[in-house]
């Protein structure tokens, strides 16, 4: 079930470093180089597969930008918060 904007903003404190923009949770992770950026994405893959919930992402030389939303619900759901928490534990 899609969470309303007030609920999302209230819960942002649960997921350090994430923001709420354009109906998505968003975070930029910074790294030393491209290799570290790609390794980070590789660590996300099994978590996303296990949850059957995959982030939108952009990989740059020394950073990865992640956006989370549940397309079938048209916005942010509990599943997005759960995935954000798991991703935060990687780094």
UniProtKB/Swiss-Prot annotation:
Pfam families: Pterin_4a (PF01329). Its EC number is 4.2.1.96. GO terms for molecular function: 4-alpha-hydroxytetrahydrobiopterin dehydratase activity. The keyword Methyltransferase does not apply. Coiled coil: none annotated. The keyword NAD does not apply. Gene3D superfamilies: Transcriptional coactivator/pterin dehydratase. Keywords: Lyase. It catalyses: (4aS,6R)-4a-hydroxy-L-erythro-5,6,7,8-tetrahydrobiopterin = (6R)-L-erythro-6,7-dihydrobiopterin + H2O. It is an enzyme of class 4 (lyase). SUPFAM superfamilies: PCD-like. Disulfide bonds: none annotated. Signal peptide: none annotated. GO terms for biological process: tetrahydrobiopterin biosynthetic process. Belongs to the pterin-4-alpha-carbinolamine dehydratase family. PANTHER family: PTERIN-4-ALPHA-CARBINOLAMINE DEHYDRATASE. This is Putative pterin-4-alpha-carbinolamine dehydratase. It comes from Sulfolobus acidocaldarius (strain ATCC 33909 / DSM 639 / JCM 8929 / NBRC 15157 / NCIMB 11770).
């Amino acid at each position: 079930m899609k969470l309303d904007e007030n609920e999302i903003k209230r819960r942002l404190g649960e997921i350090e470093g994430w923001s709420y923009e354009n109906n998505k949770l968003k975070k930029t992770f910074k790294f030393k180089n491209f290799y570290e950026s790609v390794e980070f994405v590789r660590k996300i893959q099994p978590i996303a597969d296990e949850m059957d919930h995959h982030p939108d992402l952009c990989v740059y030389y020394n950073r990865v930008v992640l956006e989370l939303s549940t397309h079938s619900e048209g916005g942010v759901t509990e599943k997005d918060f759960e995935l954000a928490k798991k991703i935060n534990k990687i780094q």
